[in-house]
Regions:
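Short beta-strand scaffold positions
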Residues: 4, 36, 69, 112-113
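A generic structural signal for short hydrophobic patches within well-formed alpha-helices
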Residues: 9-10, 41-44, 118
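A general structural signal for well-ordered alpha-helical segments in protein cores
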Residues: 21, 41, 54, 75-79, ...
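Short, well-structured N-terminal submotif of metal-dependent ribonuclease cores
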Residues: 1-36, 46-59
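Acidic, PIN/NYN-like endoribonuclease modules and their adjacent C-terminal/linker elements
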Residues: 1, 101, 105-132
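Generic structural signal for small/hydrophobic residues in well-ordered secondary structure
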Residues: 5-6, 44, 78, 104
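Short, hinge-like loop/turn segments at secondary-structure boundaries
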Residues: 51-55, 85-86, 128-132
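Active-site neighborhoods of divalent-metal-dependent phosphate/nucleic-acid chemistry enzymes
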Residues: 66-112
Length: 132
């Protein structure tokens, strides 16, 4: 199953025509197993000011499977990811990316992203990813 990060969803929803936008559209059209985490839903919806558009996008996103942190162990794993990367000289800009990575690792998901934090996490912590 492919966990799609906020960076890719935003390109897709804004119709930017990026390689990530086209790949996600292809995955969805081919009924591939695409999923989100609640954190990604939050990041997407917080930036949509128009109420009607917010509701439409929310309803669309909620059609996909949602994976969430598995309790305190996910938050501890996120901290471990951050510390491991820092110990290897890799800077993680957003702590939330460590939590998204923890959810992906715990659930055996492959993360589709366009965010350098995940490149660093993959190098340090065995996160399975693909990006374009």
């Amino acid at each position: 199953m492919i966990l799609v990060d906020t960076s890719v969803w935003i390109d897709f929803l804004e119709g930017k025509g990026s390689p990530q936008h086209h790949k996600l559209r292809m995955l969805i059209e081919n009924d591939e197993d695409v999923c989100l985490t609640g954190i990604v839903v939050t990041e997407i919806l917080q930036g949509i000011r128009d109420e009607r558009q917010n509701r439409e996008i929310r309803d669309y996103l909620l059609e996909f499977p949602i994976f969430n942190p598995q309790g305190m162990s996910s938050y501890i794993r996120a901290a471990e990811i951050y510390r491991t990367c820092a110990g290897k000289g890799k800077t993680i800009r957003k702590t939330i990316d460590c939590l998204i990575a923890a959810v992906a690792i715990e659930n055996g998901l492959v993360l589709f992203h366009n965010d350098r934090d995940f490149v660093n996490i993959q190098a340090c912590c065995g996160l399975k990813t693909f990006s374009l």
